[in-house]
Amino acid sequence: MGETSKWWWIGANHNTSNSSPWLNSTLSELDSKTKEMLSVIDEVEDEGDSLMKRAKINYENKPKLIELLEELYRSHRSLAQKHDLLIKTSSLNSDSHNSSSCDEIRSEVCEETESSDVEAETEKDQIVEFDDGDETMKEELEILREENRVYKEKKEVVTRLLANLVRVCFCFQFNWEIFSYHLLRFCLLFSHDPIGGWVICTKRFRYYFLIMFSF
């Protein structure tokens, strides 16, 4: 598989400087699994110069490919669940923060007519703390948007990778149909000896059939 066919893979080029350690770890693991799966596909396309050799490589790499798909699925699911949890937590914190802010404002307005100079100074400190909390919330929302963007990019990666796997399987099925046609012609060559031709064709067909349908 050439480099031009991997233009969709972000790999280590994504910017995660503002991301959480958990997200960085998850993305690194996802990149590693993606690289391994691409390596398996490359091995089939580069070394499978014949139908038999390609069938053998597919058979040997099938367990590894299934294992990588399972790990990729778990990483993708974990990332989606984490994203959903952050969305809900952010929404709850925002509602709680707004409710608390309204209560504080009402309290400050009521106390303003009766407060002394000392109480007025305390009120100023509370307003400063409120502004600091609002800035913190903005930073958290910005980080969440970044993580959501990266999540969408990784989702596209998984979709394109599965599309490539389907393409490889389709090509393999097409080669099998061509092979069946040539096997039939081979049997016809032994038509002068019906018994011998039948025995040889049956043995060869059984051998190739077991290889092809063991996937």
UniProtKB/Swiss-Prot annotation:
Residues 134-165 form a coiled coil. Residues 5-90 form the NAB domain. GO terms for cellular component: membrane. One of its GO terms (molecular function) is actin binding. Keywords: Coiled coil. The keyword Amino-acid biosynthesis does not apply. It comes from the Eukaryota. The keyword Coiled coil applies. Interacts with F-actin. Belongs to the NET family. Plant-specific actin binding protein. May be part of a membrane-cytoskeletal adapter complex. This is Protein NETWORKED 3B. It comes from Arabidopsis thaliana. The gene is NET3B.
